[in-house]
Curated annotation (Swiss-Prot):
PANTHER family: ATP SYNTHASE GAMMA CHAIN, ATP SYNTHASE SUBUNIT GAMMA, MITOCHONDRIAL. Keywords: ATP synthesis, Cell inner membrane, Cell membrane, CF(1), Hydrogen ion transport, Ion transport, Membrane, Transport. InterPro entries: ATP_synth_F1_ATPase_gsu, ATP_synth_F1_gsu, ATP_synth_F1_gsu_CS. F-type ATPases have 2 components, CF(1) - the catalytic core - and CF(0) - the membrane proton channel. CF(1) has five subunits: alpha(3), beta(3), gamma(1), delta(1), epsilon(1). CF(0) has three main subunits: a, b and c. Produces ATP from ADP in the presence of a proton gradient across the membrane. The gamma chain is believed to be important in regulating ATPase activity and the flow of protons through the CF(0) complex. One of its GO terms (molecular function) is ATP binding. The lineage of its organism: Bacteria, Pseudomonadati, Pseudomonadota, Alphaproteobacteria, Hyphomicrobiales. Belongs to the ATPase gamma chain family. This is ATP synthase gamma chain. It comes from Rhodopseudomonas palustris (strain BisA53). It is found in: Cell inner membrane. It holds the Pfam family ATP-synt.
Length: 292
């Protein structure tokens, strides 16, 4: 059995850990609100831009001059998985859930005889994925030095992806990230971004309105598609940021509660042990006195 001194050290250590987790919870809570507002503000713009491009693409998809980002290469043999995760841990299942979804997709594609390449954004995703896919990882971007995410970060990632696509390195690109729903709910999401998936009109929506474009649809799309790619990546980064702080806040809250439970149990054991030792000493004193 541990000595009373060991028990006191253990209780003090648990209390110190509880203070750290409580502080991390408060920091995550303070950053969550700003991250949540940024993610929610980006959604309408990204969704509307996707809808506008889908509208234009509906008329241009079949034309011979359609941009390759829309029409694709005509094949789906080589798949690039753009996996966006966090730079830090201590956030529950935030990173592992995104990696799990990407890993399942990678294995499914490989079982179909497809070639898989992985582009990692975030240190945690890279560390987990390289255990199974070290040879498939073609690039890794870390954003640890970025104090606040900006559109320029997404543009840089989009430019690298487009450069690889133009070089013929892959046929299909799928973006993986975590969509923020609430503090306790983040949804791992996979979204195909190359070639662009044109949404079919909803049933019963009637014929789509006809527009005339100046310049032609192909020219508009050639300009908008790269920007839309950056917009979708930026949205994913913002969703990830909010999801990370939500998951971290929840994880640290659970850790703080668990530490409190441990402190109560350890204190109870300490008091019982101390009481037993005092009782034993009293019995020994009384027994000695009676013997005299």
């Amino acid at each position: 059995m541990a000595s009373l001194k060991d028990m006191r050290v253990r209780i003090a250590s648990t209390k110190a850990t509880q203070k750290i987790t409580k502080a991390m919870q408060m920091v995550a809570a303070s950053k969550l609100r700003r991250a949540q507002l940024a993610a929610e503000a980006a959604r309408p713009y990204a969704e509307r831009m996707d809808a506008v491009i889908s509208n234009i693409a509906g008329a241009a998809a079949g034309s011979p001059g359609a941009p390759v980002l829309l029409a694709g290469t005509g094949k789906d043999q080589v798949h690039l998985l753009l996996v966006c995760t966090g730079e830090r841990g201590l956030s529950g299942a935030f990173n592992s859930s995104i990696v799990r979804l990407a890993r399942e997709r990678a294995f499914a594609l490989m079982n179909q005889g497809k070639e898989v390449k992985i582009f990692c954004v975030g240190r945690k995703g890279y560390e987990q994925l390289r255990r199974n896919f070290d040879r498939q990882i073609v690039e890794n971007i870390e954003l640890r030095s970025v104090r606040q995410l900006g559109f320029v970060n997404a543009e840089d990632i989009a430019a690298k992806v487009i450069a690889r696509f133009d070089a013929g390195e892959f046929d299909v690109c799928t973006l993986f990230y975590s969509r923020f729903k609430s503090v306790i709910s983040q949804i791992p999401t996979a979204q195909q971004i190359i070639p662009l998936v044109v949404e079919a009109p909803a049933a019963g929506a009637g014929p789509a309105p006809s527009y005339e474009y100046e310049p032609e649809e192909d020219e508009i799309l050639a300009s908008l598609l790269p920007r839309n790619l950056a917009v979708q990546i930026f949205r994913a980064l913002l969703e990830n940021n909010a999801s990370f702080y939500g998951a971290q806040m929840s994880a640290m809250d659970n850790a703080t509660r668990n530490a409190g439970d441990m402190i109560r149990k350890q204190t109870l054991i300490y008091n019982r042990t101390r009481q037993a030792m005092i009782t034993k000493e009293l019995i020994e004193i009384i027994s000695g006195a009676e013997a005299i």
